[in-house]
Amino acid sequence: MTNYTAINYLLYLLSKRDYSEQDLRRKLVQKEYSQEEIEQAIERAQANNWQSDERYCAGFIRYRSQQGIGPRRLKQELKLKGIKDWLINQELENAEIDWFILAEQVFEKKRPQVWDIKAKQKMWRFMLSRGFYNDHFSHLMDIDYNDTEYE
């Protein structure tokens, strides 16, 4: 791959999976292509719709939400990948994901057998670390899971 031009290397990368523009730039810089070559390659890829931050963002949201990741963490991860705020918000709205249902599924999967104050605190931290907002899961904390009627 040492004789690859910037556009060839970019196409090689994109043939494997989607990348954000920032990730592609970083990879091309690592391969020591000139700034001019990098700009031309990325412009050509975007003009031919080979690379699209919109498509990358939508796919990322779909993939990570299936792993039980909430909207706050998705926003944070996408910002680190160089995706603009307005695009993240737009794609989160277009994703048609019910965050309350997803939070409930994640919560039920991780809920401990013994439900005491320590377990509640642990679950609260877990749900926040997964990127859910308080209102997505706070109603789940008030249920008495030790009650036999719930089982």
From Swiss-Prot:
The highest taxon in the source lineage is Bacteria
Pfam families in alphabetical order:
RecX_HTH1 (PF21982), RecX_HTH2 (PF02631)
Cellular-component GO terms for this entry:
cytoplasm
Please give the chief subcellular localization of this protein. cytoplasm
State the Gene Ontology BP annotations.
Answer: regulation of DNA repair
Q: What does this protein do?
A: Modulates RecA activity.
Which HAMAP family does the record cross-reference, listed alphabetically?
RecX
Q: What is this protein called?
A: Regulatory protein RecX
Cite the source lineage.
Bacteria, Pseudomonadati, Pseudomonadota, Gammaproteobacteria, Pasteurellales
